[in-house]
Regions:
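Short regulatory "switch" loops immediately downstream of catalytic or recognition motifs
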Residues: 1-2, 55-58, 279
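Bacterial N-terminal signal peptides that target proteins for export
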Residues: 2-14
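Non-catalytic pre-domain segments flanking phosphatase-related domains
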Residues: 13, 20, 27-76, 91, ...
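Asp-based phosphoryl-transfer active-site loop
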Residues: 70-85, 276
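Short catalytic/ligand-binding loop motif for oxyanion handling, primarily in non-cytosolic enzymes
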Residues: 82, 89-90, 200-201
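A metal-dependent, Asp-based hydrolase signature
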Residues: 86, 91-170, 174
Length: 346
């Protein structure tokens, strides 16, 4: 037999139910959703990101972007992690020279290997781009892909940045890591599009950025298929360039490897200009953002845009700054837009 409730009891229960619902609602109002970008100061840059995500992911919005088309590309050096005083991959290659000379002693008398082996930091700093290209070609090829991955991973575990004495993988920008997570939480697919070596970045991209290796587009060299003494197939890295993923090579690499024009792109230098232009030129709402390194205290200050010191690494010219302003790209000021730069900062 079912329980019969008197009209008075029913009224009291209904009143209690309404009160509980109101209490739950009030509790929800006092506990808002966590801030997805806690390391960002309130300002135009933060607002541009939040407004873009909200507008492009809200069903019924005139600027709604279907999840399959939500592609966001990020440069790495100077955009996701520190690129000063020299690119980390170049440091890796310089550190590999002694092992290379040990295997090929004749290189000890050949430039630029002779200069590197001298340990003269000033002389090493004066090496030309052509010299560095020779070093990169010699230290990044001639081994199996698996051997390279193991060697690079070992170096990343041991190497330390000279300024902060921390692993290079700890010199990532916390605000940009938050953007990556925020976009992925809203069904964006995030890609790294870098002028750095594709195989090098793929070693750590998933662990450090949450970006799987198949979503890393970088400067790529050829490989050659073969069989080992045990009969197992493997790939050997060869000194033949397939894709120079810098400047115009970035949109070319995006087309080749991704197959969709990004709706959002992030960079920091002249090497990213064409990627930012290519992204902004698409139909519908687009987001192109560029990081300006203007905080010498917490990181580095270089340009030469806006009167900042000139730099051979991560050059951000005044012409690029002017183009950003003219074409409605958002300039991210490291000094004013970021509360914290690194996760380990107090």
């Amino acid at each position: 037999m079912g329980l019969r409730l008197t009209p008075g009891v029913r009224v009291r229960l209904a009143t209690l139910a309404v009160a509980c619902l109101l209490a739950v609602g009030a509790q929800a109002q006092t506990h808002p959703l966590p801030d997805p970008l806690p390391s960002w100061n309130d300002g135009a840059a933060r607002k541009a990101i939040v407004d873009f995500v909200s507008t492009t992911t809200t069903p019924g919005s005139p600027q709604f972007v279907p999840p399959a088309e939500r592609i966001a590309t990020f440069d790495q050096d100077g955009t996701l992690w520190v690129e000063k005083p020299i690119y980390s991959q170049v440091v890796y290659c310089l550190d590999r020279v002694p092992d290379l000379v040990k295997a090929k002693p004749e290189l000890a008398k050949v430039e630029p290997f002779k200069t590197v082996m001298s340990g003269d930091r000033q002389a090493i700093a004066r090496l030309s781009m052509q010299d560095l290209e020779k070093i990169l070609a010699a230290t990044l090829t001639g081994m199996s892909v698996e051997a390279f991955k193991a060697e690079a991973a070992k170096w990343l575990d041991m190497a330390r940045d000279p300024r902060w004495r921390r692993p290079y993988t700890e010199l990532t920008y916390l605000p940009m890591l938050e953007v990556l997570k925020y976009l992925r939480a809203n069904q964006f697919k995030t890609y790294i599009v870098t002028g750095g070596g594709q195989d090098f970045v793929r070693v750590y991209a998933e662990r450090v950025y949450g970006v799987p290796p198949e979503q890393v587009v970088g400067t790529a060299g050829a490989t050659k298929f073969g069989y080992g003494k045990d009969g197992k197939p493997f790939l050997t890295k060869e000194p033949r360039l397939l894709l120079n993923d810098d400047n115009a090579g970035k949109p070319e690499g995006i087309h080749l490897m991704i197959g969709r024009r990004p709706v959002a792109a992030f960079g920091n230098s002249t090497g990213d200009r064409q990627m930012l232009e290519y992204t902004k030129a698409g139909s519908g709402l687009r987001l192109s953002m560029i990081v300006l390194h203007d905080d010498a205290v917490r990181e580095y200050a270089y340009g030469p845009a806006q009167g900042l010191p000139d730099s051979k690494v991560g050059t951000f010219t005044q012409a690029l700054y002017d183009e950003a302003k003219k074409n409605a790209w958002t300039v991210i000021s490291m000094k004013t837009d970021w509360k914290r730069i690194f996760a380990w900062e107090p």
